[in-house]
Amino acid sequence: MHTFKDSLNITVSSGSGGAGCVSFLRERFKAKGGPDGGDGGRGGNVVFKVKPDLKTLSFYKNGQKLAANNGKPGMGSRKSGASGEDLVIFVPPNTRVYDVFTDSMLFELQNFDDEVIALKGGRGGLGNVNFKSSTKRTPRFAQPGESGTTLDLRLELVLIADIGLVGLPNAGKSSLISTITASRSKVGNYPFTTKVPHLGVLKSSYEDLVIADVPGIIEGASRGMGLGFEFLRHISKTKILVFLIDVASNDFMSTYSILVNELSVYDVGLSSKKRIIVANKLDLEGAIENFNQLKRALDGEKVLGISIYDNRGIDELVNELFALSRI
């Protein structure tokens, strides 16, 4: 299971160019040879590149400072200095890069082969061989290298999953994802146990499905209440939604309306996605009766009943998810 670092800030710097060289040709029988100082090398670029097997931003630390290498200085005999090595920052697909100070998105890396040069390294300085003229036969100066540049960036990962698991706090999402996948999401009997999105993988012999355990939605989440809309965007690109409803609670009938409303307010497209309504906690008193009432009220919706406690309905749910993914 991966715990998602949804957003972090880093500071990146491109390399400075190497200084040009002041040098003069020295050969036998030529006591006063002409200038032969080479140019400095280019500073390293800052490059962002998608790495397909990365799933999180956790390879980097919040506030980390990263820099490309500087170019090497020029040398005699008109030899140029070596270019500085580029700083390559590998990120998962669907990573957005923002300027911290302007809060503007600079670029987005979506596909496996995406690559962006965020900062170019400084140019190398010209060696003194470039400044020889009819009036300056022996130039004793060269250019310094151009300084590199620095940017404070915010990286944001838009979580991509096949299935988005949504529900009110304490509906049992973390327990469900732990049951049907190999993940072990933090489980506890209090609201907002899941503070960040988690991923789990449903495996079969022919297909894997990634399921996102998204923090609990509350009424008003689309306006930033509770854990807010920052987590709603994580399910914006999923193919299937699973609405998990605690049918042992007194307000189980209103839960469906709250979930649909909050998703619709945030993004009207979310409410039209393929979905399954899953009634949880069938092992508790009164839950079966409530489940039947929910099915009657939501005629036309796919409504399944489960109990994580005694594994009731789990296999049927998993099979239904695989079937729905192929439609």
UniProtKB/Swiss-Prot annotation:
Superkingdom of source: Bacteria
Domain (OBG-type G) ranges: 161-326
Main location: cytoplasm
Gene Ontology MF terms: GTP binding; GTPase activity; magnesium ion binding
One GO term (biological process): ribosome biogenesis
Binding residues for Mg(2+): S174, T194
Matches recorded under InterPro entries: G_OBG, GTP-bd, GTP-bd_Obg/CgtA, GTP1-OBG_CS, GTP1_OBG_dom, GTP1_OBG_dom_sf, OBG_GTPase, P-loop_NTPase
Places the protein is found: Cytoplasm
PANTHER family: DEVELOPMENTALLY REGULATED GTP-BINDING PROTEIN-RELATED, MITOCHONDRIAL RIBOSOME-ASSOCIATED GTPASE 2
Family: Belongs to the TRAFAC class OBG-HflX-like GTPase superfamily. OBG GTPase family.
The protein's name in its UniProt record: GTPase Obg
